Amino acid sequence: MSLFKDKTLMITGGTGSFGNAVLNRFLKTDIGEIRIFSRDEKKQDDMRHEFQAKMPEVAEKIKFSIGDVRDIASVKNAMHGVDYIFHAAALKQVPSCEFFPIEAVKTNVLGTENVLTAAIEAGVKNIVCLSTDKAAYPVNAMGTSKAMMEKVIVAKSRTVSPDKTKICCTRYGNVMCSRGSVIPLWIEQIRQGNPITLTDPKMTRFIMSLDEAVDLVLFAFEHGESGDILVQKAPACTIQTQAEAVCELFGGSKENIKVIGIRHGEKMYETLLTNEECANAIDMGNFYRVPCDKRGLNYDKYFNKGDAERNTLTEFNSNNTKLLTVEETKEKIASLEYIKEELAK
């Protein structure tokens, strides 16, 4: 963690699952301060008490700032002395964003613009923004707002020297057991003896753990260049496979799985990299890096000289990546701290 020694890291939307995972990873390192910026004072108070109880010797490194990314004044007030930012604040529930799309725009697009503007003015050195696979070929309001967020990031990266402020972006698949995800719901349904509800058994989703989510952000922080999009080469599984794995872990009946149909704005499979992005992607082992297109608006000079031959990869989606079996999915789910705690109850 030497890159973070004595530095101040700000996490927007920091009381969520990602913020908690970062605190668990960083608090016992040589980092100077972790600043949690969010709008919910109750969640901040809960987080404060939780970490004072379980890590009293380092909990003083956590500082809290109440505000909303929609309000640039509150963002600027929280930005003083910040070295690095992980921008996780977002509206991310697909159905609710379908019914309130302008709210998704206010938080995910305009809120990101506010964070980046304030960060550049404050001289923040490195910003990693969290996006989603739903931003690739978006069909719903949440994905569309995140796609626009990515465009804001790329546009902002062109306006500032990377020596002053580096801005890059990560795309996630489904982060298992994060707030609002389906596995905690299934566990509760099993315990109450209710049917396990799933949308479509053939639907596929990328899956990753919270630790892997943090790993991706740290990889982007260290290896990404300004304007880049970085993704993990994540495996996937069908929703049926995931539901059966949870049933086996928690004693539910596979016969009690109820198909309720696809919700507003959902797709049968998700895409982490489009065809066009794959053509430019750089293979970095467990990750792909998609460089920013640095060309300006003066296209005349490009008419006489085309691109070099491109890669011929197809898009990277949850149907053509490694599909896990029930046993492999169960093993991955069982390794999560949340699941270990639930199984111990």
Could you say what each language-model-derived stretch is?
Residues 30-43:
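Conserved glycine-rich Rossmann-like NAD(P)H-binding loop of the short-chain dehydrogenase/reductase
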Residues 7-29:
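N-terminal Rossmann NAD(P)H-binding glycine-rich loop of SDR-like oxidoreductase domains
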Residues 87, 91-147, 151, 155:
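Conserved Rossmann-fold NAD(P)-dependent oxidoreductase catalytic core, especially the SDR/UDP-sugar
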Residues 60-84:
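Conserved Rossmann-fold cofactor-binding substructure of NAD(P)-dependent oxidoreductases
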Residues 64, 104, 167-170:
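Hydrophobic/aromatic anchor residues within beta-strands of the central parallel beta-sheet
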Residues 115, 121, 151, 155-177, ...:
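Strand-loop microenvironment adjacent to phosphate/nucleotide-handling motifs in alpha/beta enzyme folds
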